Swiss-Prot record:
EC class of the enzyme, as a word: transferase
Reactions catalysed, as given in the entry: carbamoyl phosphate + L-ornithine = L-citrulline + phosphate + H(+)
Enzyme Commission (EC) number: 2.1.3.3
Residues that coordinate or bind carbamoyl phosphate: S57, T58, R59, T60, Q84, R108, H135, P136, T137, Q138, C273, L274, R318
Residues that bind L-ornithine: N168, D232, S236, M237
Gene Ontology annotations of biological process type: arginine biosynthetic process via ornithine; citrulline biosynthetic process; L-arginine biosynthetic process
Keywords for this protein: Amino-acid biosynthesis, Arginine biosynthesis, Cytoplasm, Transferase
Name of this protein: Ornithine carbamoyltransferase
One annotated GO molecular function: amino acid binding
Function of the protein: Reversibly catalyzes the transfer of the carbamoyl group from carbamoyl phosphate (CP) to the N(epsilon) atom of ornithine (ORN) to produce L-citrulline.
Family as reported in the entry's similarity comment: Belongs to the aspartate/ornithine carbamoyltransferase superfamily. OTCase family.
């Protein structure tokens, strides 16, 4: 059955079927191949796209801008100080105004309710570039990367997410894994595991797709036979005062070479959505080292630079998967 996503918003992977997600992944692969061959795209010719950012970004902003330009669209960027959204103008009114000017809208910010309100009132496709609850565009990039590096269908992949598993990445990876029938393990301290309602909802989805959702605080159990170990920063945007608490909670969950070896899988891959605190080459990294004596946090520099690491392929794939979302929905 053909997949048609025209006019659809992209707010969370919960809204999409396995077939629709696979369609976006296949389209991403095709668009990536065309870019590599130097084929100029025209799928978004004459389209106007607005990017609304409450939170700072490198990969998401660049991926949306380059993807849109690659396919012929025009882009307007509005940062946190460039619009009146939520300050002098309601989110609903902003959505209605921008919907008259633009063909598509991306939002990256704090509340999931904001992107949902924009989608409800804009009358155009709205894409979630990250909220505190979900980060769905990242998951498409992650799954495309797995398809490129692991010689298995997604529904045969064993995936371990290690660290703060109740953040937007933990939530979104669990949703995506359930949809695609994967063996997903959230490996974290009990207090940082995903919350019950979403877990039960995704276990029901996994029961239909042949997937499995496991929550554990046991690292050895969680990473055994894993094809993928994935981690993220220990402190999300807006939680910068939590470093001391998170370091105490998560240091036993740092991805190091011992953890890689504990998978028993010499061909496993390491993934991270970036940015990563793996060395002392950042201001924050230096501050953490001075205060807590750590040279790295969620992943060691050894693992980050090892043959197992595919983080920069993963980062590149943000471009191709975001392009696929825009092409498919506009």
């Amino acid at each position: 059955m053909p997949v048609n996503l025209k006019g659809r918003s992209f707010l969370t992977l919960k809204d999409f079927t396995s077939q629709e997600i696979q369609h976006l992944l296949d389209l991403s692969r095709d668009l990536k191949a065309k870019k590599r061959m130097g084929v100029k795209g025209e799928s978004l010719l004459g389209k106007n796209i607005v990017l609304l950012f409450e939170k700072a970004s490198t990969r998401t902003r660049c991926a949306f801008e380059v993807a849109a330009l690659d396919e012929g669209a025009h882009v307007t960027f509005l940062g946190s100080n460039d619009s009146q959204i939520g300050k002098k103008e309601s989110i609903e009114d902003t959505a209605k105004v921008l919907g008259r000017f633009y063909d598509g809208m991306e939002f990256r910010g704090f509340k999931q309710e904001t992107v949902e309100t924009l989608a409800a009132h804009a009358g155009i496709p709205v894409w979630n570039g990250l909220t505190d609850l979900y980060h769905p565009t990242q998951i498409l990039a992650d799954f495309l990367t797995i398809m490129e590096h692991i010689d298995k269908p997604l529904n045969k992949v064993k995936f371990a997410y290690v660290g703060d598993a109740r953040n937007n990445m933990g939530n979104s990876l669990m949703i995506g894994a359930a949809k695609m029938g994967m063996d997903f393990r959230a490996v974290a301290p009990k207090e940082l595991l995903p919350k019950g309602e979403l877990v039960e909802e995704m276990r029901a989805v996994a029961a239909e797709t042949g997937g499995e959702i496991t929550l554990t605080d046991d690292v050895a159990e969680g990473v055994k036979d894993a094809d993928v170990i994935y981690t993220d920063v220990w402190v999300s945007m807006g939680e910068e005062d939590q470093f001391e608490v998170r370091i105490k909670q998560l240091l036993p969950y740092q991805v190091n070479m011992d953890m890689i070896k504990a998978t028993g899988n010499p061909d496993m891959i390491f993934m991270h959505c970036l940015p990563a605190f793996h060395d002392l080459e950042t201001t924050v990294g230096k501050e953490i080292h001075e205060k807590f004596g750590l040279k790295s946090m969620e992943v060691t520099d050894e693992v980050f630079r090892s043959r197992h690491s595919v983080v920069f392929d993963e980062a590149e794939n943000r471009l191709h998967t975001i392009k696929a979302i825009m092409v498919a929905t506009l």
